[in-house]
Amino acid sequence: GFTSSPIIIGENCLIGANTVILKGVEIGDRSIIAAGSVITKNIPKESVIIQKRELN
């Protein structure tokens, strides 16, 4: 079997397209997450998350 944990998304968050949020993660109020990000840890309120990507 497997276990699951809820994902909690705060109020007024902006989450870009193709973002992956892993189980058990909490995203604080008024946070912004850029498109294509992979979120593995909790995000504090009023954060801006941009994942660095290399282009080939």
Regions of interest found by a model, annotated:
Residues 4-5, 10-11, 16-17, 22-23, ...:
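Left-handed beta-helix
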